[in-house]
Amino acid sequence: MPQQNCTVILAAGEGKRMKRDLPKALLPVLFKPMLQWVLDAARAAGAGRACVVTGCRHEQVEAWLAEHDPEAETAYQPERLGTGHAVRMASEFIRAHAQGGSVLVLNGDAPFLGAAAIRGALRRHLRDGNAVTLISARLEDPTGYGRVLRSGPEGPVRAIVEQKDASPRELAVREVNSGAYWFRQEDLLQILPEIGNDNAQGEYYLTDAVQLLIRKGRRAGACPAENPDAVLGANDCAQLHRLNALARDAVLGALMRGGVDIPCA
């Protein structure tokens, strides 16, 4: 049987700071829900069938999918217990749709992670025989992001260190984790039950899956996206406004490069 790949999109977040009636993943960037941006990128990359993990206001997300993307499947996360727990809710989907292949995990509020970055990461994932390959970005100002620590300048990943836990030397690293990953299916299914919640929030984090695989001697890699905006998401209205501004500027820039005259005022 040929290898199959599949996609799991995390869209269970409450988005409390948005103070909107819609689930965060359905909030628009240039009149299109962020979730649609993510689904479109995964499909354009040829990443197989998609499962959207829902949670807060799941009925709204499920109704939107039924109308706009009925091919997507859903898995329900009844409690928001972290990204690792969310992926675990999609375990049956992963077993059924990534037989012998790889699983792409994406955040439902990251509209600028494009198909090219997804395809490039999969090529590196398969070429290097990685158990997991995270999609990273190199930022001028990496403040607030988890740093990607490598064994050598372009070597395998040895750790992901969150900002609050990083040493001064680690804080100087400009390569950051986008929160998007390709996992080998068998490794992901094996490691998900081993993720613990011994942390201040009592949650199960998908980044711990990467650390557990590394400790087991599996190879972890990272593939930097050419567009550093790939790491951007929206946790509040100001960040959502920034995403819309960036998307608008990209459209205007493309038009002007094509010869369209757009007045400055």
Question: Model segments located where?
Answer:
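Conserved N-terminal catalytic core of the sugar/cofactor nucleotidyltransferase
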Residues: M1-C6, P33-A116, G120-R123
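Short catalytic helix/loop segments, enriched in acidic residues and glycine
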Residues: D21-V38
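Left-handed beta-helix
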Residues: P2, Q201-A265
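Short beta-strand/turn micro-motifs composed of small residues
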Residues: A11, T54, N107, S136-A137
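Short aromatic/basic micro-patch
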Residues: P28, F112, W182, G233-A234
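Conserved core of the sugar-phosphate nucleotidyltransferase
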Residues: L113-A200, T207
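Short, high-confidence coil segments that cap the C-terminus of an alpha-helix
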Residues: A47, Q99-G100, G129-V132, R218
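N-terminal nucleotide-binding beta1-loop-alpha1 segment
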Residues: M1-R20
